[in-house]
Amino acid sequence: MAPRQSQTAKRNKTQNKTRENESEVFLDSAARNLLENQPKLAAKSKVKKLSKLQVKKQQAKIRLYGAKNGKEYREEQLSIPDLNKAIVPGVKAKRGKKGKKFVDDNDSLTLNRLVKSINDKYDQVNESKLEKSRRLEEIRELKRQEMERKEQMKKDKLDGKKDELRSKASVARAARRKNAKARKADEVDEGENTVPKKKKVSFA
């Protein structure tokens, strides 16, 4: 059993402890960020620097097997559909740039309209009202022609579809008639082949 300590010894032991008086500024992170000299603020890097031997090994592996693609993607970048989410049938989410429309190379109407409307803000600097009205009229005319062409294309597409359906229906109708005629011919042949039986009467 250890000998009992006196009160004086205990007091001396506690009084002789060294105490650090640290300012509250350093303890509070928000206040510490405002200091001019920020002591020990940068966190240590978790990535260890490779030794020369490890670097050599790594380079040899790359030469042998090729470098790995170290790019990592987050979930939101991969456009994975969310689980437990109702998917509306028939609605397909658009991808790519919005409002991007491609013009055919031989589409002179659209190209002319675009050229005239793009030059609009540069030409209006020094042009008279008459010139401006003439140019705007040209743009309107080109737009009208474009609309007419679109309507005509729609109409042609619809007519083509109608003709296709009509031709399909006529082919099906002809096939049905042919089958019906063949069936009738078979029935007639079967009727000719069967000889009618003679009636017999027996007396008891």
Swiss-Prot record:
InterPro entries: Loc1 (IPR037650). Residues 118-169 form a coiled coil. The keyword Transport applies. One of its GO terms (biological process) is intracellular mRNA localization. GO terms for cellular component: nucleolus; preribosome, large subunit precursor. The keyword Iron-sulfur does not apply. Residues 1-24, 142-204 are annotated as: Disordered. Keywords: Coiled coil, mRNA transport, Nucleus, Ribosome biogenesis, Transport. Residues 142-167 have a biased composition (Basic and acidic residues). It comes from the Eukaryota. It is found in: Nucleus, Nucleolus. GO terms for molecular function: mRNA binding. Belongs to the LOC1 family. Component of the 66S pre-ribosomal particle. Required for efficient assembly and nuclear export of the 60S ribosomal subunit. PANTHER family: 60S RIBOSOMAL SUBUNIT ASSEMBLY/EXPORT PROTEIN LOC1 (PTHR28028), 60S RIBOSOMAL SUBUNIT ASSEMBLY_EXPORT PROTEIN LOC1 (PTHR28028:SF1). This is 60S ribosomal subunit assembly/export protein LOC1. The gene is LOC1.
